[in-house]
Protein backbone atom coordinates (compact mmCIF):
# COMPACT_ATOMS: atom_id res chain seq x y z
CA UNK A 1 0.00 0.00 0.00
CA UNK A 2 1.50 3.37 -0.98
CA UNK A 3 1.39 6.42 1.26
CA UNK A 4 0.29 9.97 0.53
CA UNK A 5 3.24 12.22 1.29
CA UNK A 6 2.64 15.95 1.77
CA UNK A 7 5.62 18.30 1.91
CA UNK A 8 5.06 21.91 2.96
CA UNK A 9 7.68 24.67 3.27
CA UNK A 10 7.62 26.56 6.55
CA UNK A 11 9.58 29.17 8.46
CA UNK A 12 10.72 28.77 12.09
CA UNK A 13 7.67 30.61 13.42
CA UNK A 14 5.15 28.28 11.79
CA UNK A 15 6.84 24.86 11.54
CA UNK A 16 5.72 23.55 14.94
CA UNK A 17 2.15 24.74 14.39
CA UNK A 18 2.09 23.12 10.96
CA UNK A 19 3.40 19.86 12.41
CA UNK A 20 0.58 19.88 14.98
CA UNK A 21 -2.00 20.57 12.27
CA UNK A 22 -0.89 17.62 10.14
CA UNK A 23 -1.13 15.33 13.16
CA UNK A 24 -4.63 16.67 13.88
CA UNK A 25 -5.54 15.89 10.27
CA UNK A 26 -4.64 12.24 10.77
CA UNK A 27 -1.03 11.98 9.64
CA UNK A 28 0.60 8.70 10.63
CA UNK A 29 3.98 10.40 10.84
CA UNK A 30 5.29 13.97 10.62
CA UNK A 31 8.92 15.04 10.29
CA UNK A 32 10.82 18.29 9.79
CA UNK A 33 13.89 18.63 7.59
CA UNK A 34 16.27 21.37 6.56
CA UNK A 35 15.14 22.65 3.16
CA UNK A 36 18.43 24.35 2.28
CA UNK A 37 21.20 22.26 3.89
CA UNK A 38 21.92 24.94 6.49
CA UNK A 39 23.72 24.19 9.75
CA UNK A 40 22.07 25.16 13.01
CA UNK A 41 24.45 27.37 14.93
CA UNK A 42 24.49 27.86 18.68
CA UNK A 43 21.07 28.92 20.00
CA UNK A 44 20.34 31.44 22.67
CA UNK A 45 19.80 29.77 26.06
CA UNK A 46 16.27 28.46 26.44
CA UNK A 47 15.48 28.38 22.73
CA UNK A 48 14.94 25.47 20.35
CA UNK A 49 15.77 26.81 16.89
CA UNK A 50 14.74 25.52 13.49
CA UNK A 51 16.26 26.16 10.11
CA UNK A 52 15.28 29.37 8.30
CA UNK A 53 13.80 27.13 5.57
CA UNK A 54 12.11 24.00 6.91
CA UNK A 55 10.17 21.32 5.07
CA UNK A 56 7.37 19.74 7.10
CA UNK A 57 6.49 16.28 5.77
CA UNK A 58 3.36 14.31 6.64
CA UNK A 59 2.53 10.72 5.70
CA UNK A 60 -1.15 9.80 5.30
CA UNK A 61 -2.78 6.48 4.46
CA UNK A 62 -3.55 6.04 0.78
CA UNK A 63 -7.31 5.62 1.23
CA UNK A 64 -7.65 9.33 2.02
CA UNK A 65 -9.25 11.57 -0.61
CA UNK A 66 -6.31 13.77 -1.57
CA UNK A 67 -8.32 16.75 -2.79
CA UNK A 68 -10.47 16.75 0.33
CA UNK A 69 -7.41 16.33 2.57
CA UNK A 70 -5.67 19.31 0.96
CA UNK A 71 -8.81 21.42 1.25
CA UNK A 72 -9.21 20.52 4.93
CA UNK A 73 -5.60 21.37 5.69
CA UNK A 74 -5.79 24.71 3.89
CA UNK A 75 -9.09 25.62 5.58
CA UNK A 76 -7.80 24.73 9.04
CA UNK A 77 -4.57 26.63 8.48
CA UNK A 78 -6.47 29.72 7.36
CA UNK A 79 -8.72 29.55 10.43
CA UNK A 80 -5.70 29.31 12.73
CA UNK A 81 -3.45 31.89 11.08
CA UNK A 82 -5.56 33.92 8.64
CA UNK A 83 -2.91 33.00 6.06
CA UNK A 84 -3.09 30.89 2.93
CA UNK A 85 -1.23 27.62 2.45
CA UNK A 86 -0.93 27.20 -1.30
CA UNK A 87 2.41 25.43 -1.70
CA UNK A 88 1.82 21.77 -0.83
CA UNK A 89 3.79 19.12 -2.72
CA UNK A 90 1.91 15.81 -3.04
CA UNK A 91 3.56 12.50 -3.93
CA UNK A 92 2.71 8.83 -3.52
CA UNK A 93 5.53 6.88 -1.89
CA UNK A 94 5.89 3.12 -1.91
CA UNK A 95 5.21 1.10 1.18
CA UNK A 96 8.36 -0.61 2.43
CA UNK A 97 10.16 -1.61 5.56
CA UNK A 98 11.08 1.90 6.67
CA UNK A 99 12.95 0.65 9.73
CA UNK A 100 15.09 -1.65 7.58
CA UNK A 101 15.72 1.13 5.07
CA UNK A 102 16.79 3.41 7.92
CA UNK A 103 19.07 0.75 9.37
CA UNK A 104 20.73 0.18 6.00
CA UNK A 105 21.88 3.81 5.96
CA UNK A 106 24.10 3.37 9.02
CA UNK A 107 27.39 1.51 9.16
CA UNK A 108 30.20 1.16 11.70
CA UNK A 109 32.35 4.29 12.01
CA UNK A 110 36.06 4.26 12.82
CA UNK A 111 37.71 7.00 14.86
CA UNK A 112 41.49 6.89 14.78
CA UNK A 113 43.19 3.50 14.88
CA UNK A 114 41.52 1.58 17.72
CA UNK A 115 37.98 2.88 18.21
CA UNK A 116 34.79 1.94 16.36
CA UNK A 117 31.18 2.99 16.91
CA UNK A 118 29.10 0.01 15.82
CA UNK A 119 25.28 -0.08 15.37
CA UNK A 120 23.89 -3.00 17.34
CA UNK A 121 22.67 -4.84 14.21
CA UNK A 122 26.15 -4.86 12.60
CA UNK A 123 29.09 -7.16 13.13
CA UNK A 124 32.16 -5.33 14.41
CA UNK A 125 34.61 -4.90 11.50
CA UNK A 126 37.56 -5.49 13.84
CA UNK A 127 36.71 -7.78 16.76
CA UNK A 128 39.99 -6.86 18.48
CA UNK A 129 39.29 -3.11 18.42
CA UNK A 130 37.48 -1.04 21.05
CA UNK A 131 33.95 -1.51 19.68
CA UNK A 132 31.30 0.72 21.24
CA UNK A 133 27.79 -0.52 20.45
CA UNK A 134 25.58 2.52 19.94
CA UNK A 135 22.55 2.93 17.71
CA UNK A 136 22.11 6.01 15.47
CA UNK A 137 19.10 8.22 15.98
CA UNK A 138 19.53 8.82 19.69
CA UNK A 139 18.98 12.42 20.70
CA UNK A 140 22.11 12.45 22.82
CA UNK A 141 24.95 11.76 20.40
CA UNK A 142 26.16 8.82 18.33
CA UNK A 143 29.45 9.99 16.84
CA UNK A 144 28.20 11.31 13.52
CA UNK A 145 28.52 15.00 14.43
CA UNK A 146 31.94 16.64 13.94
CA UNK A 147 32.05 17.82 17.57
CA UNK A 148 31.72 14.26 18.86
CA UNK A 149 34.08 12.89 16.22
CA UNK A 150 36.77 15.38 17.26
CA UNK A 151 36.61 14.13 20.85
CA UNK A 152 36.57 10.45 19.87
CA UNK A 153 39.60 10.91 17.64
CA UNK A 154 41.46 12.61 20.49
CA UNK A 155 40.63 9.77 22.89
CA UNK A 156 41.82 7.18 20.38
CA UNK A 157 45.19 8.91 20.17
CA UNK A 158 45.79 8.92 23.93
CA UNK A 159 46.95 6.37 26.47
CA UNK A 160 43.94 6.48 28.79
CA UNK A 161 44.73 3.22 30.62
CA UNK A 162 43.95 3.50 34.33
CA UNK A 163 42.82 7.12 34.07
CA UNK A 164 40.01 8.89 35.91
CA UNK A 165 37.77 10.63 33.33
CA UNK A 166 34.95 13.15 33.68
CA UNK A 167 32.46 13.57 30.82
CA UNK A 168 30.67 16.86 31.52
CA UNK A 169 27.50 17.02 29.42
CA UNK A 170 27.65 13.27 28.82
CA UNK A 171 24.47 12.82 26.74
CA UNK A 172 24.43 9.23 25.48
CA UNK A 173 27.65 8.53 27.38
CA UNK A 174 29.53 8.06 24.12
CA UNK A 175 32.74 9.81 25.18
CA UNK A 176 32.97 8.33 28.64
CA UNK A 177 32.13 4.85 27.40
CA UNK A 178 34.72 5.15 24.64
CA UNK A 179 37.29 6.09 27.28
CA UNK A 180 36.36 3.03 29.36
CA UNK A 181 36.62 0.70 26.36
CA UNK A 182 40.03 2.19 25.62
CA UNK A 183 41.19 1.34 29.13
CA UNK A 184 40.17 4.16 31.46
CA UNK A 185 39.60 3.04 35.04
CA UNK A 186 36.53 5.10 35.97
CA UNK A 187 34.24 7.76 34.48
CA UNK A 188 32.05 10.39 36.09
CA UNK A 189 29.28 11.55 33.74
CA UNK A 190 27.32 14.76 34.35
CA UNK A 191 24.29 16.01 32.44
CA UNK A 192 21.39 18.39 33.06
CA UNK A 193 18.90 15.96 31.46
CA UNK A 194 17.84 12.93 33.54
CA UNK A 195 16.93 11.12 30.31
CA UNK A 196 20.50 11.54 29.10
CA UNK A 197 21.73 9.90 32.30
CA UNK A 198 19.34 7.01 31.67
CA UNK A 199 20.63 6.70 28.10
CA UNK A 200 24.21 6.65 29.38
CA UNK A 201 23.43 3.88 31.86
CA UNK A 202 21.56 1.84 29.25
CA UNK A 203 24.42 2.16 26.78
CA UNK A 204 26.93 1.19 29.46
CA UNK A 205 25.06 -2.02 30.19
CA UNK A 206 24.70 -2.78 26.48
CA UNK A 207 28.48 -2.58 26.25
CA UNK A 208 29.14 -4.73 29.30
CA UNK A 209 30.45 -1.86 31.43
CA UNK A 210 30.14 -2.57 35.14
CA UNK A 211 28.03 -0.06 37.07
CA UNK A 212 30.97 0.57 39.42
CA UNK A 213 33.06 2.03 36.58
CA UNK A 214 30.52 4.72 35.61
CA UNK A 215 28.93 7.17 38.04
CA UNK A 216 26.25 9.54 36.71
CA UNK A 217 25.06 12.80 38.24
CA UNK A 218 23.01 15.91 37.67
CA UNK A 219 25.02 19.17 37.99
CA UNK A 220 25.46 20.15 41.61
CA UNK A 221 25.23 16.55 42.75
CA UNK A 222 28.55 15.43 41.27
CA UNK A 223 31.48 14.90 43.66
CA UNK A 224 34.65 16.98 43.65
CA UNK A 225 36.60 14.11 42.09
CA UNK A 226 39.60 15.46 40.17
CA UNK A 227 39.96 13.95 36.72
CA UNK A 228 43.02 13.01 34.72
CA UNK A 229 40.95 13.78 31.61
CA UNK A 230 38.13 16.34 31.52
CA UNK A 231 35.83 16.03 28.48
CA UNK A 232 33.10 18.58 27.70
CA UNK A 233 31.28 18.55 24.36
CA UNK A 234 28.59 21.16 24.95
CA UNK A 235 28.41 24.66 23.39
CA UNK A 236 30.62 27.72 23.65
CA UNK A 237 28.61 29.85 26.07
CA UNK A 238 27.96 27.08 28.63
CA UNK A 239 31.62 26.09 28.38
CA UNK A 240 32.70 29.64 29.18
CA UNK A 241 30.48 29.69 32.26
CA UNK A 242 31.75 26.28 33.38
CA UNK A 243 35.45 27.18 33.19
CA UNK A 244 36.02 27.61 36.97
CA UNK A 245 34.15 24.40 37.79
CA UNK A 246 35.90 22.29 35.15
CA UNK A 247 39.26 23.67 36.30
CA UNK A 248 38.39 22.71 39.88
CA UNK A 249 37.58 19.16 38.73
CA UNK A 250 40.82 18.63 36.76
CA UNK A 251 43.99 17.56 38.55
CA UNK A 252 47.28 19.44 37.95
CA UNK A 253 48.76 18.16 34.71
CA UNK A 254 45.42 16.71 33.64
CA UNK A 255 44.04 16.98 30.12
CA UNK A 256 41.17 19.27 29.09
CA UNK A 257 39.17 18.47 25.93
CA UNK A 258 36.43 20.90 24.83
CA UNK A 259 34.18 20.70 21.78
CA UNK A 260 30.85 22.01 20.53
CA UNK A 261 32.63 25.24 19.59
CA UNK A 262 32.42 27.08 16.28
CA UNK A 263 35.67 28.29 14.76
CA UNK A 264 34.93 31.96 15.41
CA UNK A 265 34.22 31.22 19.09
CA UNK A 266 37.56 29.56 19.82
CA UNK A 267 39.39 32.63 21.09
CA UNK A 268 36.67 33.56 23.58
CA UNK A 269 36.56 30.03 25.00
CA UNK A 270 40.36 29.82 25.19
CA UNK A 271 40.48 33.12 27.08
CA UNK A 272 38.04 31.72 29.65
CA UNK A 273 40.25 28.68 30.35
CA UNK A 274 43.75 30.15 30.13
CA UNK A 275 43.86 31.23 33.82
CA UNK A 276 43.94 27.51 34.71
CA UNK A 277 45.14 25.67 31.58
CA UNK A 278 47.96 25.86 29.05
CA UNK A 279 45.89 25.75 25.86
CA UNK A 280 46.90 24.14 22.56
CA UNK A 281 46.09 25.36 19.07
CA UNK A 282 42.52 24.51 17.96
CA UNK A 283 41.83 21.43 15.86
CA UNK A 284 39.14 21.95 13.20
CA UNK A 285 36.61 19.65 11.49
CA UNK A 286 34.18 21.39 9.13
CA UNK A 287 32.88 24.49 10.98
CA UNK A 288 33.68 23.08 14.43
CA UNK A 289 36.81 23.01 16.54
CA UNK A 290 38.23 21.07 19.45
CA UNK A 291 40.25 22.77 22.16
CA UNK A 292 42.73 20.89 24.33
CA UNK A 293 44.96 21.96 27.18
CA UNK A 294 46.85 20.86 30.29
CA UNK A 295 45.93 21.92 33.82
CA UNK A 296 48.46 24.23 35.44
CA UNK A 297 49.80 23.42 38.89
CA UNK A 298 47.93 24.89 41.82
Swiss-Prot record:
Keywords associated with the record: Cytoplasm, Methyltransferase, S-adenosyl-L-methionine, Transferase
Domain of life: Bacteria
Natural source organism: Marinobacter nauticus (strain ATCC 700491 / DSM 11845 / VT8) (Marinobacter aquaeolei)
GO CC term, one of those recorded: cytosol
Protein's UniProt name: Ribosomal protein L11 methyltransferase
GO molecular function, one term: protein-lysine N-methyltransferase activity
Catalytic activity: L-lysyl-[protein] + 3 S-adenosyl-L-methionine = N(6),N(6),N(6)-trimethyl-L-lysyl-[protein] + 3 S-adenosyl-L-homocysteine + 3 H(+)
InterPro entries per record: Ribosomal_L11_MeTrfase_PrmA (IPR050078), Ribosomal_PrmA_MeTrfase (IPR004498), SAM-dependent_MTases_sf (IPR029063)
Enzyme class: transferase
HAMAP family, A to Z: Methyltr_PrmA (MF_00735)
Any GO BP: methylation
Record localization: Cytoplasm
Principal subcellular localization: cytoplasm
Residues bound to S-adenosyl-L-methionine: 148, 169, 191, 233
NCBIfam families named in the record: prmA
Matching PANTHER family: ELECTRON TRANSFER FLAVOPROTEIN BETA SUBUNIT LYSINE METHYLTRANSFERASE
Family to which the UniProt record says this protein belongs: Belongs to the methyltransferase superfamily. PrmA family.
EC number: 2.1.1.-
Function of the protein: Methylates ribosomal protein L11.
Amino acid sequence: MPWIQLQIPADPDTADQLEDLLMEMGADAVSMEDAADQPLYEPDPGTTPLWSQTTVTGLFQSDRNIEQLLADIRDAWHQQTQQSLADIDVTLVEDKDWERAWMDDFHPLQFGERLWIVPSWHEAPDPDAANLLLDPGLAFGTGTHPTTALCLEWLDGQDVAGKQVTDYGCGSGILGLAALLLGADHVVGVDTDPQALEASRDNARRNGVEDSRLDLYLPGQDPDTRADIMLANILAQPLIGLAPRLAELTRPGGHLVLSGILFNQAREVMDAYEPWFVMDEPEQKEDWIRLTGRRKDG
